[in-house]
Amino acid sequence: MCSNFQPIKTEHAQWVEEQFGCSLPEATWRAETYPTYPAPFISLQDGKPNCDLAQFGLVPHWADDKKKFGLRTYNARSETVHEKPSYRHAWKERQFGLAIMESFYEPCWETGKAVRWRIKRADTQPIAVPSIWERFIDKETGEVIFSFSMLTVNADGHSIMQHFHKPDDEKRSIIVLNEADYLPWLHANHEQARSLLKVAPDNFLVSELAPR
């Protein structure tokens, strides 16, 4: 499960335009993203890709504490996303998006304590992660709440992702799509979406120590 990533940098604005035909938001965001932080996110607007800041950690409209809810909804298991109360509306409505980033971080416990590692694409290109999103106007504050959760899959046996998290925990991974699958994901029906939710090929990613 991924709770920390390095969002896309403005230096890759041209990559966003080439891949999605839209621009990065005219805003600032933190160098690292944690749950409830805003980060650049791709979703369809009037049928076309659009990039805006969205909160990492999905907030459904019925959430009581909308400020803290995202602390526990930043990842959604792909196997159960269609039935979990927090996620099923976004999945049913095919609110599919992409979290765009430079790299993401995971803890390796093989030394007996958590050591942070960075995972990125082997070709150093930005990463796009299949996600679901919600957007609504808070009736109490009038604020537009736009938020997302990254989908995860089992990663047991993956050459890189099997090394992260505690020894007895199931190995999970976010999904890193190939460029050819970006637009198909955004426009997918449920069957098509399911076919894209799989762990990245072993040679697609590399990892390195990234201590704080």
Predicted feature locations:
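Short linear sequence motif anchored by a di-proline
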Residues: 1-212
